[in-house]
Amino acid sequence: MAAATGAVAASAASGQAEGKKITDLRVIDLKSELKRRNLDITGVKTVLISRLKQAIEEEGGDPDNIELTVSTDTPNKKPTKGKGKKHEADELSGDASVEDDAFIKDCELENQEAHEQDGNDELKDSEEFGENEEENVHSKELLSAEENKRAHELIEAEGIEDIEKEDIESQEIEAQEGEDDTFLTAQDGEEEENEKDIAGSGDGTQEVSKPLPSEGSLAEADHTAHEEMEAHTTVKEAEDDNISVTIQAEDAITLDFDGDDLLETGKNVKITDSEASKPKDGQDAIAQSPEKESKDYEMNANHKDGKKEDCVKGDPVEKEARESSKKAESGDKEKDTLKKGPSSTGASGQAKSSSKESKDSKTSSKDDKGSTSSTSGSSGSSTKNIWVSGLSSNTKAADLKNLFGKYGKVLSAKVVTNARSPGAKCYGIVTMSSSTEVSRCIAHLHRTELHGQLISVEKVKGDPSKKEMKKENDEKSSSRSSGDKKNTSDRSSKTQASVKKEEKRSSEKSEKKESKDTKKIEGKDEKNDNGASGQTSESIKKSEEKKRISSKSPGHMVILDQTKGDHCRPSRRGRYEKIHGRSKEKERASLDKKRDKDYRRKEILPFEKMKEQRLREHLVRFERLRRAMELRRRREIAERERRERERIRIIREREERERLQRERERLEIERQKLERERMERERLERERIRIEQERRKEAERIAREREELRRQQQQLRYEQEKRNSLKRPRDVDHRRDDPYWSENKKLSLDTDARFGHGSDYSRQQNRFNDFDHRERGRFPESSAVQSSSFERRDRFVGQSEGKKARPTARREDPSFERYPKNFSDSRRNEPPPPRNELRESDRREVRGERDERRTVIIHDRPDITHPRHPREAGPNPSRPTSWKSEGSMSTDKRETRVERPERSGREVSGHSVRGAPPGNRSSASGYGSREGDRGVITDRGGGSQHYPEERHVVERHGRDTSGPRKEWHGPPSQGPSYHDTRRMGDGRAGAGMITQHSSNASPINRIVQISGNSMPRGSGSGFKPFKGGPPRRF
């Protein structure tokens, strides 16, 4: 106790008093002052200032100014957010050497006190003493220029110290198998669990901030510095607290590095076991970590500022690493997990806090028992921790602190939940200042309601799962310590082997194997060869299991790599290692001596045998290493071949895809070409069809035009024929049957009776003898070509006017309506007998008769304008002519009908064959069917003009003078289109019977009608043979 008091005085003497305004103080300083006065430190800055002013006024001081002691022991505050830590560290970074010296003195006193407490901790205290010396040297070195290098060396030295501490702990565990060791092992197991939470938790709490060895080293150095700074920060609280904090902080250092060493030496099988036990333990395991958190929270609340000051002063590089990690942390997650790198809140936060809780539990045990052993301290520590279950999810640590603060002083309060199952129940860990307060809180608060939830409050002491884990961790730590003892002796050989790291992970695995082999071999030294071989097989199994674990969990892989990298870093040789090397060599020498004594006791082996055994072990190790390298090489070769095959396969697949793509493109081009050709064919086909349709339409149009033209020509012919027929004289063929026909003809030859159509002057019977029907005055205006020898033009001069007037008058009633149309008895199909034999003689007779008539004077007939008009009333009207009596004419008509009853049918059929309109053709049938006897004058030239200049004289057949005149009954011909031909006048009915020659021989009694285009050749308006008399001769 005296030593502790001296330490407090020394640390207080090292502080510097400084007067400041309260308003200028930082929140952390305000909380520190409030905590010194045992006041509430919750609230914002204004609340804290008002509370502090009130306290100072009560003390009688100046409420505006305060005397602030800036030293290592000043801050006794609750941990603040990361930003506050950064600012605080920056401000305190200037006083590194002064406070470091004070801290070293404190640590020396505390180490001496701790050494008095436990006789078995001598070696540990000496190590801590050396560590403090190293820290002193380190703090001076960090002020020099080579900060990074010394940071690495510091971390290496710390790793070695940790191994030595583990050895000492294992010795303690072997020596004492009491509850103290169990508790330490339990703490160790908890640390391992925390490391597992960080390294292998499913929610990725192991961040990438520590893959690099340098970063990890900085974090480790930072963590170690924090742990060492914890020792001197509780001076204002109590001296006993200071002592216990020093020891427990160092224990925490040892325990924290135990997990790393487990990973380094390949014995992470223990981690797997504890990890496997964690899910089974369930909520108990969760309960342990909150307990640890609460303990650690308490310690950090008391001593955080001292830690930060020395850390910042110690190493700017460490400060940067710590600050970056502080930014990642949220709220009041503690700094001692910075060696694990910045991690997200959640499971990593629990892991961080759990390591602090383990230290805090030790602190509280030392508080209760003072200078008693850590055995009694461990049992006492659990009495200060309260486990609160059944909290609602919105409960905060401040709520717990306020609630439990009613029944005592609350050192720390934590609210924890199971990060692996979000949404699970919340639990609370509250650390009270004494066990009496714990029992008071339990008595008052158990089964009460908080935030609508019923909470249960109980001590953390009797946790069954904790005991199980203590046992497991006890076993693990004992086996680990024995392995680590041996591992230190062969450390140099391992580092040499690790220099050949071709691929980092493979070489590290082989180094793990080497370390296991080393442990096994040195185990042989202690025991016998059988034991060694058993240990070897056990270590091989462990290494395989470790490989499995590392391959399954990427978090474990990261930690294995980085810990091995830190552990086996061959290039680290610095002052710190040299400083520490002497103490390590001494320890190794003492251990070797102990082993030699044990060997001598068991079996005194000659030196040669020992050398052979060592050589064998080395050979075995090298053989294993060679096998491992060979296996790795084979794996690499296999992997290379697999990659090559995969590459070739990918290349082939790509080539095949490209080939298929090219083929598809080619086929697509072909398809497009075929499509274009098909479309071109379709287009040509459509064009062809269109052209054919156009041709067909054109042909149809031409045919329609031709038909129209033909119809128009036919209509024109019909019109002309009708016009000409209206101009023609009335046909009086029936007068051929008149008894006076032959007698009067010659008498009236010179008259104009054939133009008069029944004029008053008398007509001779033979007036047709010299008359050519083709030259008849049908066209008196233009008859230019005439074959008669006398001047016929003179005869037409007086009559032309009257004849011109006829057609207009006669057109009043169409000619085809004038006569009944009889189509019933068509007899045109009978070919008439040929009449060629009569032609020559008839021609002579006609010429002779014409000559006889040349001197006949043609009289005018002014009184007759339309001689045929009276006939329109009936089919056979009486004629107005006076040269023959009406009675004789009608008598002749009747006789003619009797003699030739079939003529009208023939005539109709003959006309219809010629294609004229049937009405026109049959219009003359009212004359007793005598139309067939009428000759039709037609143009031989085939033209449609029916005027004399186009007419040619048709050779008249000579008429038979000896035959009766009445039998010559060829009707006067008309133009080719005038099928409704009219009978000529009485005087020329017989003489006008001329026939027209066609290309073929026409029947005797018909005049062939040759129309221009429409009349078929050889189908003239044929004359039908007489039935009642001899054939008619022309």
Swiss-Prot record:
Claim: Nucleus is one of the keywords in the record: yes
Comp. bias intervals (Acidic residues): 91-101, 156-195
Skewed-composition ranges (Basic and acidic residues): 102-127, 135-155, 220-237, 270-283, 290-339, 354-370, 458-529, 539-548, 563-599, 718-757, 769-779, 790-872, 891-909, 947-969
UniProt-listed GO biological process terms: apoptotic process; regulation of mRNA processing; regulation of transcription by RNA polymerase II
Annotated Low complexity bias: 371-384, 1022-1034
Annotated ranges, domain SAP: 22-56
Chain positions found as N6-acetyllysine: 401, 1024
Modified residues (Phosphoserine): 93, 97, 139, 144, 289, 421, 550-551, 553, 748, 789, 800, 815, 909, 923, 929, 944, 998, 1002, 1014, 1019, 1021
Biased amino acid composition, Polar residues: 342-351, 879-890, 995-1016
InterPro entries in the record: Nucleotide-bd_a/b_plait_sf (IPR012677), RBD_domain_sf (IPR035979), RRM_dom (IPR000504), SAF_Modulators (IPR051738), SAP_dom (IPR003034), SAP_dom_sf (IPR036361)
One GO cellular component, as annotated: nucleoplasm
Family annotation (SMART domains): RRM (SM00360), SAP (SM00513)
Annotated region (Disordered), positions in chain: 55-242, 268-387, 456-599, 713-1034
Domain of life assignment: Eukaryota
Cross-link (Glycyl lysine isopeptide (Lys-Gly) (interchain with G-Cter in SUMO2)): 500, 884, 1024, 1027
GO molecular function, one term: sequence-specific DNA binding
Keywords: Acetylation, Apoptosis, Coiled coil, Isopeptide bond, Methylation, Nucleus, Phosphoprotein, Repressor, RNA-binding, Transcription, Transcription regulation, Ubl conjugation
Location, primary (coarse class): nucleus
Sections of the chain in a coiled coil: 609-728
PANTHER family: SAFB-LIKE TRANSCRIPTION MODULATOR (PTHR15683:SF5), SCAFFOLD ATTACHMENT FACTOR B-RELATED (PTHR15683)
Function statement: When overexpressed, acts as a general inhibitor of transcription that eventually leads to apoptosis.
Protein name, UniProt field: SAFB-like transcription modulator
Protein source organism: Homo sapiens
Gene giving rise to this polypeptide: SLTM
